[in-house]
C-alpha cells in the first residue's frame, strides 16, 4: 500500500546515448513530507518541467529511485504495473490553466476522476462536494466553467487534483495568471489542503510573490538541484 510523502534519490534523465548524451536532470535528491508544501524554482530550461514529468510518470527517468510513502515506485525502472492508475490515484496535478471540461458542471468536473476509477457516481459526487465545500465554492457546484471567475476555476482545479486523495500533488505554475491577492489565496489553499489531507505538494513557480511563503525551496539549474531554507513568511 502506498503511503504519504515522496522521496527522490539520485534521479537523472538523459537524452541520447554515449558521448552525445545530454542530461536534463543530474542526480536529483528531494524529499517532501506529508502535509508539506515546497517550492521548486529555476530559470527556463533548467529542468523543472522534465523533473515534473518524471515525478508524474509522464516520461521515464534514466536512473535513480522514487518512493511514495513506504513503497518504491521507481528503481532503475518502474516498480508499479499500471502507470495510468498511478497517475490517476496517487499523483494529483494542478496546472497554470485549470483545463476544466467546458460541457461538465463544477461537480462533475471534480467527480470525473473517481468515476473513471470505478467509483459509484453518488460517492464520487459526495467526495467532490466535500472538497468544493472545503475550498469555499460549494455555492457554484451546478455552475458551468464559463460562469466561474479565474480564482473559482483554479479552486475547482485544486479540488479535482485532490479528489482521489493522492499522497502527492504536482502544481505547475498554479498562480502565474493571477494577481497578488488571488495568488496568495491559492497558496493558502494549497497549504490548508496539504495539512488537512496529509498531502505532499511540490509547487513549480517563477512567481516572486509566493516564493517567500515556502519554508523549504529546491533550486534547479542545468538539471541539478540544491535545497535551501525559505522564509516561510506568514500569509497576509
Model-derived regions, located:
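Short coil-to-helix segment of the ABC ATPase nucleotide-binding domain corresponding to the Q-loop/switch region
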Residues: 104-113
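A short, proline-enriched helix->beta-strand linker immediately N-terminal to the Walker B motif
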Residues: 163-167
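Conserved ABC ATPase signature
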Residues: 144-154
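Conserved ABC transporter NBD signature motif
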Residues: 64-75
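ABC ATPase NBD coupling module
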Residues: 73-92
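Helix-to-loop junction immediately C-terminal to a conserved catalytic motif
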Residues: 56
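Catalytic Walker B motif of ABC-type/P-loop ATPase nucleotide-binding domains
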Residues: 169-172
